[in-house]
Amino acid sequence: MGPDELAELVDRHSAALVLYARQWCGCPEDVVQTAFLKLVRLRARPDNLVPWLYRVVRNGAIDASRAARRRQKYEAAAADRADPWFSPSDDPTGLDARTATAALADLPAETREIVVAHLWGGLTFEQIAQTVGSSAATCYRRYAAGLATLRQKLGAECPATPTR
């Protein structure tokens, strides 16, 4: 199959194939692209090209849907098994683990990464800077801002001055 013939086939059928695949999976464009790649790699052209494309797209979309369900199931199971950031405490005056975890999760990702790396990982700001690709001063500022946000949300005592 020549490039012009393939381009015409893509132009004529790709939109309908994407719509067709969308009923089974959340990545219909990927499935359609894979179907066209399979077509290009064939040694012999299928007798009924358009029905062949629909069958390949259908099978690919169903496979993608199954893979997504499996992935979601395993990711949910892994999240359920993951250790919480905070351990529940028997001290009624202490922080509630769920509230503290939620407050930490609400921080921007780059700030949360720095707070966790410094508080729980024991990394210095220089080490964190090397890890995240920022300067130590930027990491320090984000850490201080993260602690201030946590302090405000939790009404908890946090170290006022982070240690370098």
Model-inferred region functions:
Residues A100, I114-V115:
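Short alpha-helical "packing" element that flanks the helix-turn-helix/winged-helix DNA-binding module
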Residues E5, Q130-T131, L147-R164:
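C-terminal edge and immediately downstream basic/flexible tail or linker adjoining helix-turn-helix-like DNA-binding
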Residues Q23, T99-P108:
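Short amphipathic alpha-helical boundary/capping segments
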Residues M1-E29, V40, A44, R112:
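A short, charge-rich alpha-helical start-of-domain segment used by transcription regulators
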Residues L17, A21, P28-V40, L53-V56, ...:
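Short, small-hydrophobic-rich alpha-helical interface motif
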Residues T34-V50, A67-R69, K153:
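Sigma70-family region 2
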Residues A105, A109, E113, G121-R141, ...:
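Helix-turn-helix DNA-binding module
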Residues N48, R58-A77, T93:
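Arg/Lys-rich amphipathic alpha helix in sigma70-family domain 2
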